[in-house]
Amino acid sequence: MNTRQLLSVGIDIGTTTTQVIFSRLELVNRAAVSQVPRYEFIKREISWQSPVFFTPVDKQGGLKEAELKTLILEQYHAAGIEPESVDSGAIIITGESAKTRNARPAVMALSQSLGDFVVASAGPHLESVIAGHGAGAQTLSEQRLCRVLNIDIGGGTANYALFDAGKISGTACLNVGGRLLETDSHGRVVYAHKPGQMIVDECFGAGTDARSLTGAQLVQVTRRMAELIVEVIDGTLSPLAQALMQTGLLPAGVTPEIITLSGGVGECYRHQPADPFCFADIGPLLATALHDHPRLREMNVQFPAQTVRATVIGAGAHTLSLSGSTIWLEGVQLPLRNLPVAIPIDETDLVGAWQQALIQLDLDPKTDAYVLALPASLPVRYAAVLTVINALVDFVARFPNPHPLLVVAGQDFGKALGMLLRPQLQQLPLAVIDEVIVRAGDYIDIGTPLFGGSVVPVTVKSLAFPS
């Protein structure tokens, strides 16, 4: 059996906390001898995980770059791992941290200093999907062929990911979390974040000083927070819930058969701390309010495989050298790195499906760089190729983008597709890379052309989650 072993790292930089997880990944080539390699994870073993530590942020809300790097390198040292010995990795920045003014440059600099890592600055949709995968909700949904809703409740947000038979069918994000009111060790509020203040104002009147709230009033606030979280599940939102939504709603009329709770508040829901203010916030009180909520008690709430560590544990990477002149490459400056892949779910409406896939990745179709994947089940027939061409032309017309049009396909018709597409998109840099197998959540690198431009090396990077 053709297998590869990798030492990988997953770094999750969240609103409140950061964590580092080292893993040993084993991949097996499932392709036949004559086919392009197609690797899948067969073993994912967490070899070391750091304590959860607070994300270093300055008073202006920016990430403290040097301090963050020092903290992460300390975890390498504690694990007894040298940065150069790591084969692959993923850095995910989520929640309010992803919105800080220097988030992207700070994480890119960190990635370059540590190695060849996937970097994802996750907005509310992608954060929901990553947490749902990391918690094990996607696997549970796939194994039981049912609808599973994971709600990842952290410091600043509650992120919802709905899986139907293993496929993501909806995401949402509500600005409710356990650290919206920060406290001292005695439960006195020392700082109220804006969404937290909005909830306080609704409970006790506009202009209420959150620092004056009693313990009983904090319980009242967290009960309202729990109600807001449940309103999103039911799809009946109060004006306050509507104001706190960061995204659209979950699909209407769809009832999850299982609900799982992850994130820091999910961990408190599972193991309630004796001291409700041990984290200097109201997270444990919110977990208690969720426990006591009558509507949640009616639902099938189960503990997920992971709660506070519902995140990536690394990334598997494998290089594919593409065969002879099967690709189309014109006007594209290579190499390109860390390109997210948009995979269409609905094959009958490719334009809408690509747009939806980009929304799930928190990407703007008109400004961001990405790769459009073709459906794996698309037949290698002339009629199917024409359908794809019409969809790509329509997509480019609806979403003009300064980046090259990059298309990836598992089928062996890259050259034909490129030749037929070129006359209709005359000024647009275009690459069609075929015989590459990609899955939801993958990123790819496209290397410098070889053999006179007929072959490019492509690296497919798949995020790894706890097994």
Swiss-Prot record:
GO terms for biological process: ethanolamine catabolic process; protein repair. Keywords: Bacterial microcompartment, Chaperone. Transmembrane segments: none annotated. It comes from the Bacteria. One of its GO terms (cellular component) is bacterial microcompartment. The keyword Chaperone applies. Reactivates suicidally inhibited ethanolamine ammonia-lyase (EAL), cyanocobalamin-inactivated EAL and O(2)-inactivated EAL; requires Mg(2+), ATP and adenosylcobalamin. Reactivation probably occurs by the ATP-dependent exchange of cobalamin. Belongs to the EutA family. PANTHER family: CELL DIVISION PROTEIN FTSA-RELATED, ETHANOLAMINE AMMONIA-LYASE REACTIVASE EUTA. This is Ethanolamine ammonia-lyase reactivase EutA.
